[in-house]
């Protein structure tokens, strides 16, 4: 099938052995009951095979709705899926799943969510620092605190659990491209993704709502590490109703930003945008 035919949010692409693996929030009702996750495979980012079922919840699984934003990470020879889940009366959280193949089947690896159990959280991603120490970077959701934040916590080396408390880094309202005119005063944080530039700068991409709709931009760590402090780029990368993105390098060596756009269901699709790494930051290729 064509990429334009795949309804998907929060796209995440991994290039393995000459094949593009596309993960994301799939299904025609991601806002309701969760059924699992599917993936797709492509040679050219235009034509895809699939869907391939990569995760289906076991009977008694703790969550039953809002199965969101699966990211597949290669780590120490294993394939790990970071994904967010929700149930009535239970805070949304990011759990870690594991498989021996990029198409799964993925099974529970952490004991429930790794994110704080009393926080409404989503969109956990893996960051491994220069010493090989793993962290989860995630969103503390606006539905609980109104001005959503980005936070991180250290992980055990086997990715089974948190190895320390969560630390909040910055709030959505600190972004100059955030929609500060929102009448109810809420500010969204979505989809953090860490990237080290060719010049050694550590960037964090994340999404919120700007004046023209859903938008994605980035912050720069002034220390070069996960602890920050984090300073925003003045302008977003994309602010026309698209976001929750990540970066990957295609077969030709071109850096690609993938986002979903538009941001309305059921019309969301994966979009692939060429990006220039300037050493200090990122710009979209004209």
For the regions a protein language model found, what residue spans apply to each?
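Carbohydrate-active catalytic/glycan-binding domains of CAZyme proteins
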Residues: 1-286
């Amino acid at each position: 099938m064509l990429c334009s035919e795949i309804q998907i949010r929060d796209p995440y692409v991994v290039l393995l052995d000459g094949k593009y693996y596309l993960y994301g929030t799939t299904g025609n009702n991601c806002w309701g009951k969760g059924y699992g996750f599917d993936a797709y495979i492509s040679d050219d980012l235009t034509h895809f095979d699939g869907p391939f079922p990569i995760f289906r919840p076991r009977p008694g699984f703790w969550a039953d709705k809002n199965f969101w934003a699966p990211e597949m990470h290669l780590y120490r020879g294993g394939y790990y899926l970071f994904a967010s889940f929700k149930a009535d009366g239970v805070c949304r959280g990011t759990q870690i799943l594991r498989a021996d193949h990029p198409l799964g089947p993925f099974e529970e690896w952490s004991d429930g969510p790794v994110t704080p159990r009393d926080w409404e959280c989503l969109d956990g991603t893996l960051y491994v620092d220069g010493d090989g120490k793993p962290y989860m970077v995630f969103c503390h959701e606006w539905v609980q605190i109104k001005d959503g934040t980005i936070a991180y916590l250290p992980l055990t080396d086997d990715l089974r659990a948190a190895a320390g408390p969560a630390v909040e880094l910055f709030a959505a309202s600190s972004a100059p491209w955030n929609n500060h005119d929102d009448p109810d005063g809420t500010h969204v944080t979505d989809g953090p993704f860490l990237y080290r530039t060719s010049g050694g700068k550590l960037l964090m991409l994340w999404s919120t709502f700007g004046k023209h709709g859903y938008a994605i931009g980035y912050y720069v760590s002034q220390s070069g590490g996960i602890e920050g402090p984090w300073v925003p780029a003045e302008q977003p990368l994309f602010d026309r109703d698209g976001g929750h993105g990540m970066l990957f390098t295609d077969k030709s060596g071109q850096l690609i930003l993938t986002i979903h756009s538009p941001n309305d269901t059921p019309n969301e699709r994966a979009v692939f945008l060429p990006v220039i790494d300037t050493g200090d930051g990122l710009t979209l290729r004209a």
